[in-house]
Amino acid sequence: MPGNSFGRLFRISTWGESHGVGLGVVIDGCPAGLELDLAAIQAQLDRRRVGQSRMTSARREPDEVEILSGMFEGRTTGTALAMLIRNTNARSSDYDAIKHLYRPGHADHSYDAKYGFRDYRGGGRSSARETAARVAAGAVARQILATMGISLVAYTLSLGHLKAQIIDENEIENNIMRCPDPAVAEQMIAYVDQARRDLDSLGGVVEVRARGVPAGLGEPVFDKLDALIGHAMFSIPAVKAVEIGSGIEAGNARGSQNNDPFIQRADGSIGTSSNHAGGILGGISSSEEIVVRLTAKPPASIAQEQTTVDQAGEPATIVVKGRHDPTVLPRLVPVAEAMLALVLVDCVLQQRAARL
C-alpha cells in the first residue's frame, strides 16, 4: 500500500491500524540538535485523543508517545525520528456482527474493491485513529516553527447551522467544542447532545491560522503552497472541502472587493490592508496570516438502522455499534494544526535550500 508518506525534505511516514498493536510515525529530515520537548508532543496528543469529553468517542486510549529512535540526550540526532503510540483499549468484538457488511459512508467497499481484502476492525488503516501519528509528527514540526516565530491556532468555526460570531482565542480550550465563541459553544454542545439522542452525528467547519509565516514559501505551478495545504488537509479523514482566505466567497465578489491592496508596514516590510487571499499569492506565502478552513462531514458511524449490502451484494440492514464520535470537530482542531505545521516546516526547509 503506497501513499503512507507526506513531505519532501521533512518527510513523514505513518503506519498502524485502529485495532492493531499500535500506530506510529517515522520522520526523515528532522534537523539535528533540536531540543525536543516530549511534554509538548504529549500535550498535542492529549488534545486529539478519544474519551476526553462527551463530544468524542468513549474509547479510552492514553495515547502515550514513545520515542524509538532519532533522539539522544534530549536532542534530535538528524537520523530517522520514530515515535510509537500503542493501542490499549480496542474492542474488536464490536465489529464481528458486521464484518461482512458494508457500512454506509465508510471505506469498506472501496478497500475491498482495491485490495480484495480488508481489516474490518474499526476500518483498519482507513480509521481516523491514524491521525494520532500525524499529530505527533506535527508537534515536532511546531517546535521547529516556533524557533522561527511561526505559530498556529485552530478552532471550531461552525457546527451545522451554528457559527461562531466572535473569535476569542482565549476561549478555545475552555469548552469541549473548542469554539472561540463561548455562547455559541454552549449551543453547539446542546446540538450534539440532541444528535446523539437521535442516534445521529453532525459535521461542520474548522478554521486554522498560521502567523509569523515569512514571504516566499511555496513553489510555482504544481507545488504551490495552497496546493500543498489542500493535499494535506484533504488527506484527513472526513474532510470534504478546503478553503483558503475568502474561499468560495471569492466567487461572489468583484475584483475590486477581493483584491488586497499593498501597504508598507510600520517596520518597513510589505503587507496588505486586507487578507482575502489568506496569506498566499501565486502559490507563495505573502507574509500575511495564512487562513484555512476545513469542512468535515458528519461521522459515518451512527447507531440508526441503515440499508446496505453484504460482500456478495445481497441487501441487508446494518446498525453500527461500538464507540464513535458524534462529531469530529473538537478532535479535528489539533489534526488541522498538525497538518499545516507539517506543510510549513517542509516549505521552510525547501526555501533554505532554494537560494544562497
From Swiss-Prot:
PROSITE patterns: CHORISMATE_SYNTHASE_1 (PS00787), CHORISMATE_SYNTHASE_2 (PS00788)
Single GO term (MF): FMN binding
Pathway info: Metabolic intermediate biosynthesis; chorismate biosynthesis; chorismate from D-erythrose 4-phosphate and phosphoenolpyruvate: step 7/7
Residues noted as binding FMN in the record, renumbered to the chain: R125, S126, S127, G282, K297, P298, P299, A300, S301, R323
Protein EC: 4.2.3.5
Gene Ontology CC, one term: cytosol
Keyword Lyase: yes
GO biological process: amino acid biosynthetic process; aromatic amino acid family biosynthetic process; chorismate biosynthetic process
Keywords in alphabetical order: Amino-acid biosynthesis, Aromatic amino acid biosynthesis, FAD, Flavoprotein, FMN, Lyase, NADP
Record-listed NADP(+) binding positions: R48, R54
Keyword hit for RNA-binding: no
Cofactor note: Reduced FMN (FMNH(2)).
Coiled coil: none
Cofactor(s) the record lists: FMNH2
CDD domains: Chorismate_synthase
Catalytic activity: 5-O-(1-carboxyvinyl)-3-phosphoshikimate = chorismate + phosphate
Family annotation (InterPro entries): Chorismate_synth, Chorismate_synth_AroC_sf, Chorismate_synthase_CS
Similarity comment: family membership: Belongs to the chorismate synthase family.
NCBIfam families on file: aroC, PRK05382.1
Self-association state and partner proteins as the record states: Homotetramer.
Protein function: This reaction introduces a second double bond into the aromatic ring system.
Protein name as annotated: Chorismate synthase
The organism of origin for this protein: Herpetosiphon aurantiacus (strain ATCC 23779 / DSM 785 / 114-95)
